[in-house]
């Protein structure tokens, strides 16, 4: 009985070392979650009070479902309108 337990423990250890720890679902890896800079949104739209709504409307005109004002690629970047096919985190 102890030999079986040792064998199972060895098998689990081997699987963790070779395969790594299970990571669950990866977020933001889908091409549908990729955020693309809007081509039609006028500059300064995101600075307005209803900037996210204007951005979403511009993205809808570009055949996207979601649009949001973001600081990309860095937090220090200028606020711009980005579009994506799906709403992703």
Swiss-Prot record:
Main location: secreted
GO CC, alphabetical: extracellular region
Entry keywords, A to Z: Antimicrobial, Disulfide bond, Fungicide, Plant defense, Secreted, Signal
UniProt-listed GO biological process terms: defense response to fungus; killing of cells of another organism
The protein's name: Putative defensin-like protein 40
Membrane-spanning segments: none
Subcellular localization, as worded in the UniProt entry: Secreted
Residues in the signal sequence: 1-26
Family classification: Belongs to the DEFL family.
Superkingdom to which the source organism belongs: Eukaryota
Cysteine pairs bridged by disulfides in the record: 33-88, 46-69, 55-81, 59-83
């Amino acid at each position: 009985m102890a030999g079986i337990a040792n064998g199972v423990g060895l098998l689990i250890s081997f699987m963790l070392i070779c395969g790594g720890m299970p990571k669950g679902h990866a977020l933001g890896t889908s091409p549908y979650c990729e955020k693309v800079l809007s081509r039609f949104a006028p500059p300064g739209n995101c600075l307005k009070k209803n900037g996210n709504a204007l951005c979403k409307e511009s993205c809808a005109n570009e055949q996207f479902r979601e649009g949001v004002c973001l600081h990309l690629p860095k937090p220090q970047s200028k606020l711009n309108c980005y579009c994506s096919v799906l709403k992703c985190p």
